[in-house]
Amino acid sequence: MILLGSTGSIGTNALEVASHFDIPIESLCAGKNITLLNQQIAHYAPKNVCIADKNDAHKLINGNYKLFFGSEGILEMIESSHSHLLLNALVGFAGLKPSFKALQCNKKLALANKESLVNAGWLLQNADITPIDSEHFGLWYLQNNRPITKLYITASGGAFRDYPLDKIALATPQEALKHPNWQMGYKITIDSASMANKLFEILEARWLFDIESIDAFIEPSSSMHALIEFADGSITTHISTPDMKLPIAYALDKDKAAQMPFIQPLDIQSLCLALKNIDTLRYPLWNLKDTLLHTPQKGIVLNASNEIAIEAFLAQKIPFGHISALILAMMEYFDSFKFASLCDLESIQAFDNQVRAVSSQWLERKIKE
C-alpha cells in the first residue's frame, strides 16, 4: 500500500488496519512529524519515503528506502511505487494532484482528502474512488442499488455546538480545538466548529453519488452517520460507534472488513439519538449549502479562503468569527466568475491561487482595522 499522510489520525489508523489485513506498506509520505515517521519506518520498512521539507532529511533514521521530497516528490513516489492501493490522507489542496496521479497510474484510490472532490469533483466524478469518511461510508453501505430520493449526513456540531452564541465570534484556537466527540487534526477540528467540514462533505456526496438532493443534521452523539430516503418512501440509517477504523477497513479490503469486528458494537438500549437542524446563526457558513450544491465548482472558493483563514486563526492573527466572514466575503466577490471555464487541473490551480491572493488581502485589511 501507498500511504500519503501517514502520521495524521487517518494515517495511523490506516496502518493499524493494514497490519490486521497483512497489507505490506510500500510507500509512506508525511509532513513535519519526523519522530512518528521514524517509528513507522522502523516498524513497516517501506521501500519509499517522502517528506515535506528536504531540510528534515537529516532527522530520518537510516534504512533501505528511497527518499523523496515535497509536492513533486509525492508524485514521483506514486509513479515509482508498484502497489495497486493508494490511501490519500493528505490535508488540504495539497492532496489534489496526488489523487489525479494515483488514478493516472491505475491505482485504487482510497480517499480521505476531502479537498480532491471539493476542488475538482467534476473531473473525478467517474473515477474509481472509495471514500474514507464515516458519512460517505455510511451512504455507500446503505444504498444497495435502490432508487434514491435524498441523502442525509450528520454533523457533531463541533466545539461550539453548545457554546454561548455571543462568544463564538471572538473564540480562540484553544477553544475551537475542543471537539466534543473526536480526536482529529487541527484543520478538520476547526472545520467542524465552523461547519465548513460538513459543506465539504455535502460536495463530496454530490460527486460520489451523483445527486443534488443532500442535507445534513446535527446528531450530537456522532453515532448516526448517514440516512438515505428512497423512492419507495422508506428511510434507512447507518449507526455505529464513532471510529474511523470501520470506513478505513472497508476501503482497504471490503471482503475482509465484513468478516472482522473493527469497532465495539453500540449498546442499542442506551442510545439517545436526536437530529437537530443546523442553525445558521451559530454556523453562518451553512447559508452556502444550496449555492454550493447548485454550483459545486464554488467549492474552490470555499476551500481556498478557508485554508487562508485557518492559517491566520491558528497563528492567532484573527478571531474565530473572521473565518466565516472571509469565506462569505470571497463567495460574494467571486460570484460572477465563469466557473464553467474550470475544465482541467491547471485552470483549477490558477483560480485557487487567485482566491488565496484576494483572501490574504482581505485578511490584511481586517487585521489592520
Swiss-Prot record:
Molecular function as annotated in GO: 1-deoxy-D-xylulose-5-phosphate reductoisomerase activity; manganese ion binding; NADPH binding
Keywords: Isoprene biosynthesis, Manganese, Metal-binding, NADP, Oxidoreductase
EC class name: oxidoreductase
Coiled-coil stretches: none
GO biological process terms on file: isopentenyl diphosphate biosynthetic process, methylerythritol 4-phosphate pathway involved in terpenoid biosynthetic process
Binding-site residues for Mn(2+), renumbered to this chain: D133, E135, E201
Pfam name, any one: DXPR_C
Chain sites annotated for binding NADPH: T7, G8, S9, I10, G31, K32, N33, N113, E115, G185
Catalytic activity, reaction form: 2-C-methyl-D-erythritol 4-phosphate + NADP(+) = 1-deoxy-D-xylulose 5-phosphate + NADPH + H(+)
Binding residues for 1-deoxy-D-xylulose 5-phosphate: K114, S134, E135, S156, H179, S192, N197, K198, E201
Cofactor needs: Mg(2+); Mn(2+)
E.C. no: 1.1.1.267
Pathway where this protein functions: Isoprenoid biosynthesis; isopentenyl diphosphate biosynthesis via DXP pathway; isopentenyl diphosphate from 1-deoxy-D-xylulose 5-phosphate: step 1/6
Keyword Membrane annotated: no
NCBIfam families found in the cross-reference section: Dxr
Protein family (similarity comment): Belongs to the DXR family.
Reported function: Catalyzes the NADPH-dependent rearrangement and reduction of 1-deoxy-D-xylulose-5-phosphate (DXP) to 2-C-methyl-D-erythritol 4-phosphate (MEP).
HAMAP family cross-referenced by the UniProt entry: DXP_reductoisom
Protein name per Swiss-Prot or TrEMBL: 1-deoxy-D-xylulose 5-phosphate reductoisomerase
Primary gene name: dxr
